[in-house]
Amino acid sequence: MASEQLARRENTTTEKEIHVEKHRVPKMATHFEHLAEQAKESDITAGKDTPQGSIEALQAGERVKDHAGKAMGDIGGRGKARETHELGAHFESLADKVTDHAAANVVGNKESQREARGGVRDVGKFEMRTEGGEKGNKDRPELKTRTREVIGRTEKERGRESGGQVVAEKGRETETARGRVGAENEGARTTAVITCTLEKGGGTQKPIREEERESESERSAWEQISNYSDQATQGVKEKYERAKQAASETLNTTTQTAQEKSAQAKNLAAQAKDATLEKGQQGYAVTKDTISSAAKTASEKTAPVAEKAKDYTLQAAEKAKSAGGTTASYVGEKAVQAKDVAVESGKSAAGYAAKVAADLRDKATAVGWAAAHFSAEKTVEGTKAAAHVVEGAAGYAGHKAAELASMSAGAVKGLAASAGETAKEYTAKKKEEAQRELEAKKPSQPQEAEERPSEGIGETVRQYAQKPKPSEGNPQKEGTGSIVFTAIGETVSSAGEKVKKPFKNTMGGESEGGGGKEEGKSVIGKSLTSIGEKLGDAKQREELLDNVTGNITEGGGEVLGAVGETVAEIGQNMMKPAEIVQERAHVRQAGGVLDAIGETIAEIAETTRVMVSGEDERVLRQSVVLETRVTGRAKHEEGSHGA
């Protein structure tokens, strides 16, 4: 029988390998909810589908316990008590494991039934897949009763009827539907299932006690699973609530922080604004105070400066006024000093002024005669030049006109030469006499007058003469200035009269000539008479006196030099009319010779008068008009005589 049993066991189909793939479930709550559903389904079908394999396994465990003594006595055969004892203990531990995992096996059986329908499902962190399809479903009853091969050998020593050796091995997982052993075991792939096959068939009745115990263990397992599921769900909910609360608190904290920061920013902005306004007001006040103080300081500094400037202006005005008064007083002081000096020396101020005036008169006389002498020389030269020019012009006229021109030219030339020589000699004589008288009078002057510088005397006389004295002043001082002006005027007038007389005498000696000669003489006489009258005019005397007085201010020794320069200018101006006469002589006829000579002399006299008197252009224009009239009159007379 042992051989038959062995052959039957060798024909047993090989177990089907079921691969368990590990898959990680993202959410723990989903897993526990799935386990809860499985628990509910198992409660419904608890009495209907009881897996036989698990019950047989339990029975086999009990039987293994009952026959443990026999097995331990038979195995080894030769006093191997220690090994037998260890093997018995091992079987007991295996039986305990089978008992402990009964509920897990029940759950696995339920899941295996679902897998019979095919498909893939998740259990915990594992993905369960059934291979084989319909074939696997057909082989399921056979898989439930599958066992490990047990080779038993009978021992002939004791002569027992049957003997066997039960060898229990750990093998590979034999369940088609693999369940998860224990809710807490997440990665276990192998489970130990021990099935024992007894050689002697026994009854397969299921004790009631075992069923009750299995039910209780199953309930406890499902209760534990439910508790675990509830705890996990509650934990997830608590975590979710805590996370939600933390997020809400974080949001509230963030909002509150943002509000606080915003309020702080507003407060800081308001404080900055207030500080800026305050600083601006302070700066404005400081600037205002600075500007006002600067303006006040400037006004305070400017006011004294303005006052000083005003005072300085007033002082300058006072100084100018006082300077004017000082000048006037200086002139008066000089006059008084001159008077005091004259009184101290035994002479009155009038006598001293008379002597000074006499000295100036003598000097002016000498200067006048020198000027007259020079003028006479220039006049003679101009007349001679005019005569030569007329002679040249007369040569172009006809024969009769040439004779008349020659006669007229000879007469005029002789007249002018004689008159010029006479005037020249007379002026030279008067000049020498005046100089001798001046030199003779110098030793007779008082010692004090000689010691006084001529510049001081000239300045005193000029200031005293220019500044008119008040009417209530000393009449003796006014008389002194008048004496000086009168003396100089008389000197110039007498010089003019003396220059005029020789020309009159010359014209009187030649009055017995022809009609043409008489007309020429009359023209010359008129010209010379006008010269004398102009030189003797009061206005001429005053202007000449002013010029002489102005030159006297530079000192008595510089009077002759100034007069010499004036006479030189007079001579240059005298040459210009001679050139004009020469130009006119080329275009005039012989009958206009006397007119040309008369006009030349008149122009010379007029130029002399203008240079001496210093008249302006208006007087020169009047002289030109007068010259034109004289020329027109001469032409008219010439035309009447020609007719």
Swiss-Prot record:
Compositional bias (Polar residues): 223-234, 247-262
Residues in coiled coil: 237-279
Expressed in which tissues: Expressed in the leaf primodium and the vascular tissues of the hypocotyl-radicle axis of mature seeds. High protein levels in dry and mature soybean seeds, but not found in fresh immature seeds.
Keywords on record: Biotin, Coiled coil, Germination
Compositional bias segments (type: Basic and acidic residues): 111-161, 169-187, 207-221, 426-442
Any Gene Ontology biological process: cold acclimation
Coiled coil keyword on record: yes
Signal peptide: none
Modified residue annotations for N6-biotinyllysine: K125
Keyword Coiled coil: yes
Chain spans, region Disordered: 105-262, 426-480, 501-522
Highest rank taxon of the organism: Eukaryota
PANTHER family linked to this entry: LATE EMBRYOGENESIS ABUNDANT DOMAIN-CONTAINING PROTEIN / LEA DOMAIN-CONTAINING PROTEIN, LATE EMBRYOGENESIS ABUNDANT DOMAIN-CONTAINING PROTEIN _ LEA DOMAIN-CONTAINING PROTEIN
Family: Belongs to the seed biotin-containing protein SBP65 family.
Cited function: May serve as a biotin provider for several growth-limiting enzymes that are necessary during seed development and the subsequent germination stages, and thus may play some roles in determining seed germination capacity.
Protein's UniProt name: Seed biotin-containing protein SBP65
